[in-house]
Amino acid sequence: MAQILVLYYSVGGSVQRMAELIAEGVERVPGAAAKLRTVPIVAPATQTAAPAVPPEGAPYAELKDLEACAGLALGSPGYFGNMAAPLKHLFDGTVPLWQKGALAGKPACVFTATGSLHGGQETTLLSMMLPLLHHGMVIVGTPYTQPELSATRAGGTPYGPSHFAGVADDQPVTDAERALCIAQGKRLAGMALKLRG
C-alpha cells in the first residue's frame, strides 16, 4: 500500500478542507492510502507551547511520517506570498532526512488558500516547492488536461490546487476547486504507485 502523507497547516479551516479533498482523491486510487497530518503553531519562547497532541483533527506530523510516505501533498495558507511559519519550521528540521536522501525520488504536490483573490497563491505554492526540490522530490503539478483548471473563476493553478477563502475565511470551496483537489490527490497517488514500480 502506497501511503500518501497529506500534510497541512490551517487556521480558518479552508486548507484543512482542501487536505481532506486531496485525501479523498488519494483514497480513490487502488493501492494507495492517505494519512492526514498537521503541524502545531510556532510561538515565541515567551508564549505557551502548543500541546503535544492536538485536541481535535489530524495528529501532528513527525519526521518518521515524512520518511515513511510514498508521496507528499503539502498545504498552507498564503502569508504575504509565502508558506506559513509552522510548515517552514517543520521543514527546517528535516536536515536528517535530507542528509540520507529519505525523500529523494518521491512525488509531491502543493496546495494553498488565500484571503484575497490576488493574495500570492502562486508564490505561496512555489515557496512550498523549494524545500521539496532540495530533498529531491518530484513535483506533481495540475495539468490543463484537468478541465476545471481552465474553467475556474476562483482558485486553481498549474502549480497546484488553490482556493480563494476570503478575508474572513468564509468562502466555501467551489465545485471547480473541489474537483481540482480530488484530481490532484488521484494524480499524486497514481504517480507514487508508478514511481514505486
Task: For every predicted segment, state its role.
Residues 1-102, 164-197:
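N-terminal beta1-alpha1-beta2 submodule of the flavodoxin-like/Rossmannoid cofactor-binding fold
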Residues 92-95, 99, 113-116, 134, ...:
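Alpha-helix boundary/capping detector
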